[in-house]
Curated annotation (Swiss-Prot):
Transmembrane segments: none annotated. It is found in: Cytoplasm. GO terms for cellular component: mitochondrial large ribosomal subunit; mitochondrion. Residues 13-27, 320-329, 773-788 have a biased composition (Polar residues). This is Sperm head and tail associated protein. The gene is Nsun4. Isoforms 3 and 4 are expressed in testis (at protein level). Residues 277-290, 710-723, 733-754 have a biased composition (Low complexity). Interacts with CRISP2. Keywords: Cytoplasm. Residues 521-806 are annotated as: Interaction with CRISP2. Residues 1-36, 257-329, 428-496, 707-806 are annotated as: Disordered.
Length: 806
């Protein structure tokens, strides 16, 4: 059995009070000393042998060596003083049970391949979140954990510390995480001949197995807890012990070394750099994995500011921009290993500090063929930390880490998308979030689609970001004949706004629809009812797409209706255009008018392709949601219903104009005065208009002068004229006139009766004064159809009832 490069996992707990972390209710083996009560630091070291030749060499690799001669760190004793800076997990509690069978004992005879520091983050043994079991928890120091599923609601505050300095601790996120930490070399320690890289683990003998116990050898240190099985008859082997066969392939991580040790030269030899060009598919090994070796070693593991060429041939959007810190920060490299195999190569990563992310595989992928691992790696739909209850791959991030960007979504959607349907606004207002599509490796060919090949990279770096691939929904229903089923259209759309969400779901696929600015002169003759389906649920074909298409059902039963894709506009503002009758009101029950079908104004797409015998529905003309008169829509202002006379609008009514018919043709007792009224034609407005106030506009101005009354009245009602003359007779009653003029606008009949009642109570002195005022030149400003006769008649009418009553 060939042994693969070892992998170190250190779980150290800070030494606190003896009784705080380690109560006495935990049962230790009889031969184990009471090191827990003395405040020990448990350490777990693991060696993961994997089958050689099936490595994900294109994956991120860990810091192989902190010295220039990193390839001899496991064979050359002088370099064993340096710590193995690959992974550190600091936790006050250790996993007690690991749901994997006991593997065969490791063989450390064959040396690992040089210049490699492998790491297996996709192990069900290491890469699962710890979840506390409901029963059997013995103590905070040694709790029972199951390594399956999502973290428990009792989140633990772990600490990520260096291997050599446990006092320098940094708080992790609330949930348990795997922290990728590198550490400076321990130069002061003397070299020891041991395969273990850390000097503290030199004399520790470990057994292979998944159960925690504390059998310490006589020569070992007394402040460490060792993972060992219940089978104590197994031969003890010094050094790294646990060796489960995990999917028969190794996954490497590439560390971002701290600035203090960046002067040692290249730390990741024979590994692929960030700016290395994508390898051709001919150079891929026959194992079928999507990661390949790069013959040219990079000069450093530090991330470049931008990846000029994407890592694969899938080509979906802007390239990867790995920023190793905040903007303006002098720290170019970061501590920790960055995993980007789960991301699309054009995603933007911003990790201000170290522990970055962890990817976990489903448990059944341990013995599955080589196709299951890339599928879990490539899953881009990351909604939150715990959106995955089934135990599939997920992503853990630390505070400050932002991942944004599109996803490689070109195939059929996956059913594992997050349960809510998130909707991110876009300039087009019709982008629908789609689930991840057909995860593939970086160098795997794209699945055959109807989309044309993507644009090549232009010269400028800004235009190098290829536009996102957009696929519109099928515009034909499911029962369309084969001759009309070719209605797919692939378009390129502008990029969404470059906003950095906390966890920007990268599975956003905009659906482009065609817009038109031409108004339909008349609705289709065969259109019976047009309905707009509200996007309440997602169709089965696209579980993450919240938009349902709008259908235009036709009256003919044999013709399938066209489907409008991705409807997000549901505001119908098109006026009726199928009749040439004057503008009517909803209160008019006597004139039956045909109610035409109203086309909702929005973004739609007409059926594509030349129709053979089907008359297609003309799309609406407005692309504005809340605009009654769109700017790009020509309209006739004479058709606006704001003039008090009837007009016949032409056949083409501009889209986006509401017809407000507010005039009642029947005289009402208390009609409502609305300034904008559409009256009936002059043939119908007979003497009934004298009592209808809706066709009368009275403008009384009492602020300029007491005796100046501007009266515009075209009716012949004597009551109104007399009331107006009565209002203008006394200059001492200015406030009363103003109040009555206000009330007259609401109910003119009531104010006229009040004036008549008041005029009967007036004396002879007021009549004389009103007669004099009626003969004054101020009365010439009273505008009516007959001035002189009307004044004389009104004065006589005022005089006669008062004289009789007197």
């Amino acid at each position: 059995m060939n042994s693969s490069p070892p992998f170190l996992l250190k779980i150290s707990a800070p030494s606190t009070s003896p009784q705080a972390d380690c109560p006495n209710n935990y049962s230790f083996p009889p031969e184990s000393p009471s090191s827990c009560r003395k405040g020990f630091t448990p350490v777990l070291t693991l060696e993961v042998p994997v089958a050689p030749g099936k490595d994900f060499n294109d994956h991120l690799s860990c810091n192989a060596g902190l010295s220039p001669n990193a390839g001899n760190r496991f064979t050359n004793p002088p370099y064993s003083r340096e710590p193995f800076s690959c992974l550190t997990i600091s936790s006050p509690c250790l996993p007690r049970r690991i749901p994997t069978p006991p593997p065969p004992p490791p063989v450390l005879s064959s040396p690992p391949p040089p210049e490699r520091c492998p790491f297996e983050p996709f192990s069900p043994l290491l890469g699962r979140l710890y979840r506390q079991e409901p029963a059997g928890s013995s103590s905070p120091c040694f709790d029972r954990f199951s390594l399956q599923g999502s973290p428990s609601p009792h989140q633990r505050n772990l600490c990520c510390n260096y291997i050599d300095s446990p006092e320098s601790q940094r708080s992790c996120p609330p949930s348990p995480r795997l922290c990728y930490v590198t550490s400076p070399p321990l130069i002061h320690q003397a070299p020891r001949a041991s395969p273990v890289t850390s000097p503290e683990l030199t004399h520790i003998t470990l057994e292979t197995g998944p159960v925690i116990s504390t059998p310490l050898m006589p020569g070992s240190q007394g402040n460490y807890s060792i993972i060992s099985p219940l089978l104590t008859h197994r031969p003890l082997r010094p050094g790294l012990a646990i060796s489960p066969p995990l999917a028969h392939r190794s996954v490497e991580t590439r560390p971002l070394t701290p600035a203090s040790i960046s002067h040692r030269g290249p730390h990741c030899p024979s590994r692929r750099s960030y700016n290395d060009p994508p390898l051709s598919s001919a150079s891929s090994p026959p194992s079928g994995n999507p990661y390949h070796d790069n013959p040219m070693p990079p000069n450093s593991c530090e991330p470049k500011p931008q990846l000029d060429v994407p890592l694969g041939k899938n080509g979906c959007g802007p390239p990867l921009s790995s920023q190793a810190g905040m903007s303006g920060s002098p720290i170019s490299p970061q501590e920790g290993c960055i995993h980007y195999s789960h991301l699309c190569p054009d995603s933007q990563i911003s990790a201000p500090r170290s522990p970055f992310c962890v990817i976990n595989l489903p448990p059944e992928s341990a013995g599955s063929p080589s196709s299951s691992l890339p599928q879990a790696l490539q899953k881009p739909c990351v909604g939150s930390f715990l959106w995955e209850p089934g135990g599939n791959s997920y992503l853990l991030l630390t505070p400050g880490t932002i991942i944004s960007g599109p996803s490689c979504t070109t195939g059929p959607p996956l059913p594992q998308c997050p349960n809510p349907s998130p909707y991110f606004p876009s300039p087009l207002n019709n982008q629908c979030v789609a689930p991840p599509q057909s995860p593939r490796g970086y160098n795997e060919p794209r699945p055959p689609t109807s989309a044309p090949p993507q644009m090549k990279s232009p010269k400028s770096p800004e235009s190098r970001r290829n536009p996102y691939k957009c696929r519109s929904l099928d515009n034909t229903p499911h029962h369309t004949p084969p001759s009309h089923s070719k209605s797919h259209k692939t378009n390129t759309c502008p990029q969404p706004p470059s906003q950095s969400f906390g966890l920007f779901s990268p599975c956003m696929e905009p659906a482009i629809t065609t817009t038109s600015n031409s108004c339909p002169k008349e609705p289709p003759p065969e259109t019976a009812v047009l309905k707009t389906v509200a996007p309440t649920s997602c169709p089965h074909s696209s579980p993450c797409n919240p938009a349902l298409p709008s259908r235009y059902p036709k009256s003919s039963p044999h013709v399938p209706p066209p489907v409008s894709p991705c409807n997000t506009h549901m505001y119908s503002v098109v006026p009726p255009t199928s009749h040439l009758s004057p503008l009517s009101s909803p209160l008019n029950q006597s004139i039956p008018l045909p109610q035409p079908a109203v086309l909702p104004c929005g973004t739609y797409s007409a059926p594509r392709g030349p129709p053979s015998h089907i008359k297609s529905v003309a799309p609406p003309c407005s692309t504005h949601i809340y605009s009654f008169i769109p700017l790009r829509t020509p309209f006739d202002p004479r058709c606006l219903p704001v003039v008090p006379r009837a007009r016949f609008c032409p056949t083409t009514v501009p889209c986006g104009i509401h017809t407000y018919a507010v005039t009642s043709p029947v005289p009402l007792n208390n009609p409502s005065q609305i300034p904008y009224s559409c009256s009936l034609p002059p043939s119908k407005t007979s003497s009934t208009c004298s009592t209808s106030v809706s066709s009368t506009i009275v403008c009384s101005d009492y602020q300029s002068s007491d005796s100046q009354i501007n009266h515009q009245n075209k009716s012949q009602s004597p009551n109104k004229n007399s009331s107006l003359h009565n209002q203008s007779k006394s200059p001492l009653r200015r406030g009363a006139f103003q109040s009555r003029s206000r009330s007259r606008s609401s109910s003119p009949l009531q104010s006229s009766t009040q004036d008549r009642n008041e005029s009967t109570n007036m004396g002879v002195k007021h009549h004389k004064r009103s007669r004099k005022q009626s003969q004054s030149p101020a009365d010439g400003k009273i505008e009516s159809q007959s001035k002189s006769l009307q004044h004389r008649k009104s004065v006589g009418q005022i005089k006669s009832p008062h004289s009789k009553k007197k």
